[in-house]
Amino acid sequence: MISHVKFVGIPTRDQDRALAFYTEKLGFRIATDQPFNEKQRWIELRIGDSPTGWVLFTPDGHEDRIGTFFNGALAVDDVEATYEQLNGKGVEFVSPPKKEAWGTFAIFKDPDGNQFVLSSR
């Protein structure tokens, strides 16, 4: 039986730039950073104590997927406060905080154009 999500692959053009973005701007921590092949490393990040890894890696032949990841949602206690904090760090938002009946959300993108949702719990 499936127990949890082990990792999610985030396609990236420049692993060093993506690593700096996710760790310095978003506060992810490095779980693994090791050579994978001649061109790339296996970089796996974590958020807090979550068992799910975020892997900054693009398999050969899948470069067309860079910038197409969409709608991964990150839970935060306060969308507006997190928006202000990340916006102050230079994170680019495509949608400022919006309140809906189901909660508040905002959408930002990483340096490759992959988009993620900040969502209230």
Enumerate the predicted regions with their spans.
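Core segments of cupin and vicinal oxygen chelate
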Residues: 9-52
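Conserved beta-strand in the GNAT
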Residues: 54-57, 116-119
